[in-house]
Amino acid sequence: MYLPIFCIFLSVVDSLRILQIVPGFTNSHVLFNYRLAETLRFLGHDVKMWTQMEMAMLDTGNNKLPEGVSEYRIPIHFTDTLKTEGLKVFQSMMFESGDAHDLWWTGQEFKDMRVEACEQMLRHDESVYEDFRKDGFDVAIAHFHDLCPLAIAKKMNVKRVIWITHGTSIYEFSAVQLGLRTIPSTIPHPLSSAGFSQLFLDRVQNTLWHLSLLDFVNLPQNLLVDENLFYREFVGADQDDLWDLAKTTVPSLLINGDRMLDFPRPLPIHIAFSGELGVSKGKKLVMEKWLEDIIEKPSDGLIVFSLGTVSNTTNMPAQMINSFLGAFGKLKTYTILWRMEKSVAGAEKYENLHLVKWLPQKDIMRHPKMKLMIAHGGYNSFLEAAQAGIPAVLMPLFADQKINAKRAQRYGMATVLDKLDLTINNVYGAIKEALKPEYSTNAKKLSAMLSDQVARKPYSALRYSLKLATSPKPSLFTLKSQHLSFLEFHNLDIFSIVLLTAFIVCF
């Protein structure tokens, strides 16, 4: 009985032709996919990228296409001006409260954008699709923001697709496609601030977040229904729809991140954490002279304040700016680098404060003078701080950043700020707390934990997923629950018969 499984793992995945379907929503998405492509090239595979360009927010000048990788960029032009300007609206909203209506509105806009973008891509120049078909791809790797990548892969005659997440969380709509059901009582929702708490109110909040994804926030589950209705009209009722393709062409899911940084949860073998992606260049760290001159100034150490590549700091409210500025003014013995896209009135008064439009953040994190990271709680910043053993002050703005802050707090390496309750004293207090020795000690312990794992080949999860995706018998390791409805999965059909029988007998 073990022979078929043994044969699967005897087969060696040599050079594969891999199609990467990239959701070019943000600079962060593109950067992540470039790192993934670079890793695949390092493993000896041929990679071609299909990148959808939308909302005019990708080219910051910091991303470079990996050597040996080709990319086709398909422009998306929305008919609605509001959707074209969607990034600007979203970037201003993330500094605000984000009430229920804002979250619902964002979900509706995002849903319409995904369906329209999918239609444009599927109706794109047929000669381009023919060129992709000639490449004879073995497998596609795509982000699960919607189901359209399955349609694109099918049109290019790609038989297998690996889902990959952009963040380190599994949303309910992606988990269900792989036969995994989330348990709200024990598994924190990616958008919930409850974290790992199992108190009654926290479990209520967690459950409501899970239920809300039907028609809410930035990834509503009914998006998949609307997209599938369009696809059925596009290909005809006699063809497999997107739900069918999800069940027959997707054998595995990669979660972007390190398992140690997530909350514990049971996962089947075809769902795995990717670990760090990207190839270390092995070069000595060399800073640009202007940056090195700033860092090497005599001080108690370096503090970096950066809110990532998605948020536009020109939209930062005055209250937020003044709170941080005032707090930095009290930290005169530290050198502070503030990644900011506009000038800040009053910043010139502080010799220790330096405003810059861009930073090599990953390199700076490993500089010996680095003491503290102030960030929004994006996964990349969280991962970089954890790997470098640097404590953090996190101020979540949107999406999964609240849960990332909870992850960091769980290890005792971070303090957290509420973006709606900022004062000079609040910010200063959070920074001074995080600068205490115990936070640095905890951060270094976490860094050691990330390094001290079971010995394995580099990029083993990625290698393993490629093996599963190209296996001739994916049914050996995928879950049967992938093909069950909600009623069947929870045995509600059986319970209903039992209850009905009991009711008839008793009454």
From Swiss-Prot:
Q: What is its EC number?
A: 2.4.1.17
Highest taxon listed in the record's lineage? Eukaryota
- Name of this chain's protein: Putative UDP-glucuronosyltransferase ugt-60
Q: Which GO terms describe its molecular function?
A: glucuronosyltransferase activity; UDP-glycosyltransferase activity
Q: What is its main location?
A: membrane
The catalytic activity, as recorded, is:
glucuronate acceptor + UDP-alpha-D-glucuronate = acceptor beta-D-glucuronoside + UDP + H(+)
Gene that specifies this protein: ugt-60
State the species of origin: Caenorhabditis elegans
Into which family does the record put it?
Belongs to the UDP-glycosyltransferase family.
Its membrane topology: Single-pass membrane protein
The lineage is: Eukaryota, Metazoa, Ecdysozoa, Nematoda, Chromadorea
Write down the top EC class of this protein: transferase
One Pfam entry name: UDPGT
Residues the record marks as carrying a glycan: N312
| Gene3D superfamilies documented for this protein | Glycogen Phosphorylase B
Bilayer-crossing regions: 379-399
